[in-house]
Amino acid sequence: MDDIIEILATVEIFKDLDREGLTRIAERCWRDRYNRRQTIFTVGDDSADVYFIKSGRVGITIFSESGKEISFRQQKAGEMFGEIAAIDRLRRSTSAVALTNLELFRLSDSDFLRIMRERPEISIRVMQRLAFLVRALSERIFEFTTYGVRNRIQAELLRLAKASGQRSETINIYPAPTHADIASQVSTHREAVTREFGHLASEGILEKRGRNLIIRNLARLEKMVNDVN
């Protein structure tokens, strides 16, 4: 139980809860484990549970009929996913896949909605999260309609840099995403990512060191993103 409470305390929507409030939620959670590449739910599923990540990473994706993967985002320990289906009671609009071995805590949609009704501060944080997702999707739509492949790859690197929370000109992203991960995020092929990474490395902007991806010149990367081509 203590490990559930510890993880719930790191989830953004529960930041205002005391230990008693967290304990009440923890008592309603189920523990799930998944192996790498195992599917948690798929587009069209009628499940509506909400998930909180204890350890590992989850990819939120859609697969086309031809099998091409379009990745929306990756989520890590302390984050939540699956809440949209819990709120609107419609079928899943995306798939969730374990990118690593994964441990989750699962809360039913009925318990999630009851908590939102009982705790207005949680409802407000859920709305703030949904607003964030809408803004992120709007940004993606702009990029796909305006940017070429190279700019989209650069924009994804910039997004990863900002998501790291580091406040310096040199950003260390760990673990480094694979070229295939980046490609699925920006709807291109792995070879295009490899070429662009090579170009950025030759310009002194990017460096791969073991499992670390180091952005050496954040300001220059941002300028390249804005120089649409």
Which role does the model predict for each range below?
Residues M1-R36, A85-A86, E118:
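Cyclic nucleotide-binding regulatory module and flanking cytosolic helices
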Residues R37, A48-T61, A77-G78:
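Glycine- and acidic-residue-biased ligand/ion/polar-headgroup-sensing regions
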Residues R73-R135:
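Cyclic-nucleotide recognition modules
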Residues R117-S187:
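Polybasic "coupling" helices that flank or enter modular domains
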